[in-house]
Amino acid sequence: MKIAVVAANGRAGKLIVKEAVERGHDVTAFVRGENQTAAEKAVQKDIMDLTSEDLASFDVVIDAFGAWTPETLGGHVATSQHLCDALSGTDVRLLIVGGAGSLFVNPEHTQRVMDGPDFPEAFVPLATAQGEELEKLRSRNDVAWTFVSPAADFQADGERTGAYILGGEELTLNEAGESVISYADYAIAMVDEIESGDHIRQRISVVRK
């Protein structure tokens, strides 16, 4: 498959590129600076400058954008909506590296992880931004999007186990009662989702088995 990874130089983006390349996919990294990924093909271009023409030849576009500072958090909504506009009305799938804060913790889907008293205050702005991103996506019936939430403990340097549980809108715990996944295992789940073609216009979540 022809896969575009946007913001590919980030830690999640690089591992997703690596996983897809190792499985034999035709991957193009879209980066702002020098290509630091395993992809042989790279395009230096800001996300907000990408056009429909830039993305038309791909089967799947992965939005791996990440922002953590107050002045850049709005980029989560802005970048994913810009990509939606570029892909509107096409068959190109859009997969977004999402967050865990917006996962629900009750069957009624009225309480989210970030609403709990134990949720770290420092992460509330990021969780809020990614939650808004998801809500905006839910209204995009013109795009084949999938929002992929990691576990609550998303470990950049965690172990690559190759085993994960696929969940949905609710926070999922493994047999050890943990909500944890490494970036490497998340990349496996992301490429599995690309290959399966499931969960169009849905949010899914992944946790280490």
List each language-model region with its residue ranges:
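N-terminal Rossmann NAD(P)H-binding glycine-rich loop of SDR-like oxidoreductase domains
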Residues: 3-23
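Short, polar loop motifs at secondary-structure junctions
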Residues: 29-36, 152
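NAD(P)H-binding glycine-rich loop region in Rossmannoid oxidoreductase-like domains
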Residues: 34-90
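Conserved Rossmann-fold NAD(P)-dependent oxidoreductase catalytic core, especially the SDR/UDP-sugar
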Residues: 82-125, 139
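Substrate-positioning beta->alpha
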Residues: 129, 177-191, 202
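Conserved beta-loop-beta element that borders a ligand/cofactor-binding pocket
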Residues: 135-156
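Core catalytic loop region at the nicotinamide-binding pocket of NAD(P)H-dependent oxidoreductases
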Residues: 145, 196-208
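A conserved pocket-lining segment of Rossmann-fold NAD(P)-dependent short-chain dehydrogenase/reductase
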Residues: 164-181
